[in-house]
From Swiss-Prot:
Name the record gives this protein: Non-structural protein NS-S
Function as written in the Swiss-Prot or TrEMBL entry: Multifunctional protein that plays two independent roles: viral suppressor of host RNAi (VSR) and viral inducer of host attractiveness to insect vectors (VIA). Acts as a suppressor of RNA-mediated gene silencing, also known as post-transcriptional gene silencing (PTGS), a mechanism of plant viral defense that limits the accumulation of viral RNAs. Also inhibits signal transduction by the phytohormone jasmonate, making the infected plant more attractive to aphids, which are the second host to play a role as a dissemination vector. Acts by binding to and inhibiting MYC2 transcription factor.
Gene: NSS
SUBUNIT field: Interacts with host MYC2.
Organism this protein belongs to: Tomato spotted wilt virus (strain Bulgarian L3) (TSWV)
Family the entry assigns: Belongs to the tospovirus NS-S protein family.
Pfam family for this entry, one: WIV_2
Length: 467
């Protein structure tokens, strides 16, 4: 998806921030980077509330693999051990992604928290208690995007009624590597001989309220959008398989699942780097408290040094056998995504027309001018448009005719953030301008082929819908 779609999703989720009825519900996102290279080792998003609890641990100290019969797995593996949660693992040549979804979870309207960390095998010296962003980048080899989201995403969150200002300094905390998240009896404080450095943004807003957030909270919203994390997700993990690791998840699910214990030692067919994976799943139900402890461990160990050029491979593992479909928890950003896709398609057609005519084209107007039809023949396709008595060109969408002709509609369309739009509130019009001739020629063929693909997926025919 494009960055503009991510902006729309962030704005929509920010607009319902904190509206959940569960005051103890929270989404925690974690990013752990490697000291020395700054590369992202793992990113995790966990949901917890008064009954659902989620925590995880990550370490580069793997040790010996358990003794199990080794298997070679390829493409799609189906192991139906759960009938009331959705659990899957996907592995390719660079990452392992793990997802646990349950219909006891609804992250819509839940507040997010972000936690940025760097993993080190040894304790560092001469690290102050506060550092600015540039010093963090130099000392820990992090990039700007690792620390703080792009301005456009912060602006999108603020348009969604949050209040976020970019921070410049961070409080640095050091601790032994241990379990993270809602640590409880299911995830004991298991220290590993590694160090974690945490970076907490220093709050820089004079006045604050319950809509005031730091930039890592916005980064958490962005992580949900980029990874298409569903609202019923209790745990999502994406770990780089370019490094040795042991990943542990300790979840408490507030319903009774059947007792399960499964272990697998395997390699993936087509993996030239010869990685070995170990998977352990233990499910312990408690009928008295109507809850289940779900403990998952994944180990990735390399038998050969990882080469830069890797042949692609993919493995999908499904562990669910849902007897009935969930009562789906709908993401509130879905309508915004549909509108954005429709308007992007309409604008793409209009841009082709605009580039060929080499003049501005109005794609929306509040005014009810008398228009006469016109046609532009492009060989493979004919674009219908209209023009007024002043010879100004129009490429209007029937979809937008259902909206009231007032400034609220203009403000709504402005919030969708199509980059090429020029919005004139005074005239009540939205128009686009021609691209440079060299750019237009190079993109014409791509535009038309891309539009044809989009048009086949969207029921409305925008080209013939002009008046």
């Amino acid at each position: 998806m494009s960055s503009s779609v991510y902006e729309s999703i962030i704005q929509t989720r920010a607009s319902v921030w904190g509206s959940t009825a569960s005051g103890k519900a929270v989404v925690d996102s974690y990013w752990i980077h490697e000291l020395g290279t700054g590369s992202l080792l793992v990113q995790t998003q966990l949901y917890s509330d008064s009954r659902s609890k989620s925590s995880f641990g990550y370490t580069a100290k793997v040790g010996n693999l358990p003794c199990e019969e080794e298997e070679i797995l390829s493409q799609h593996v189906y192991i139906p051990i759960f009938d009331d949660i959705d659990f899957s693992i996907n592995i390719d040549d660079s990452v392992l992604a793990l997802s646990v979804c349950s219909n006891t979870v609804n992250t819509n309207g839940v507040k997010h928290q972000g936690h940025l960390k760097v993993l080190s095998p040894d304790q560092l010296h001469s690290i102050g208690s506060t550092m600015n962003r540039s010093d963090i980048k130099d000392r820990f080899q992090l990039q700007e995007k690792d620390i703080i989201p792009n301005d456009r995403y912060i602006e999108a969150a603020n348009k969604g009624s949050l209040s976020c200002v970019k921070e410049h300094t961070y409080k640095i905390e050091t601790c032994y590597n241990q379990a993270l998240g809602k640590v409880n009896v299911l995830s004991p404080n298991r220290n590993v001989h590694e160090w974690l450095y945490s970076f907490k943004p220093s709050f820089n807003q004079v006045e604050s309220n319950n809509r005031t957030v730091n930039s890592l909270a916005v980064k958490s919203l962005l992580m949900s959008a980029e990874n298409n994390i569903m609202p019923n997700s209790q745990a999502f993990v994406k770990a780089s398989t370019d490094s040795h690791f042991k990943l542990s998840l300790w979840l408490r699910v507030p319903k009774v699942l059947k007792q399960v214990s499964i272990q697998k030692l395997f390699k993936v067919a087509g993996d030239e780097t010869n990685k070995t994976f170990y998977l352990s799943i233990v499910c312990i139900p408690n009928h008295n408290s109507v809850e289940t402890a779900l403990n998952i461990s994944v180990i990735c160990k390399h038998q050969l040094p990882i080469r830069k050029c890797k042949a692609p491979f993919e493995l999908s593992m499904m562990f669910s056998d849902l007897k009935e479909p969930y009562n789906i928890v709908h993401d509130p950003s879905y309508p915004q995504r549909i509108v954005h896709a429709l308007l992007e398609t309409h604008t793409s057609f209009a841009q082709v027309l605009c580039n060929n005519l080499q003049e501005d084209v109005i794609i929306y107007t509040l005014n009810n001018y008398e228009l006469t039809p016109g046609k532009l023949d492009l060989g493979e396709r004919t674009l219908n448009y209209s023009e007024d008595i002043c010879k100004r060109k129009y490429f209007l969408s029937k979809t937008l005719e259902c909206l009231p002709s007032n400034t609220q509609t203009m403000s709504y369309l402005d919030s969708i953030q199509i980059p090429s739009w020029k919005i004139d509130f005074a005239r009540g019009e939205i128009k686009i301008s021609p691209q440079p001739v060299s750019v237009a020629k190079s993109l014409l063929k791509l535009d038309l082929s891309g539009i044809k693909k989009k048009g086949s997926k969207i029921s409305e025919t925008h080209a013939s819908g002009s008046k």
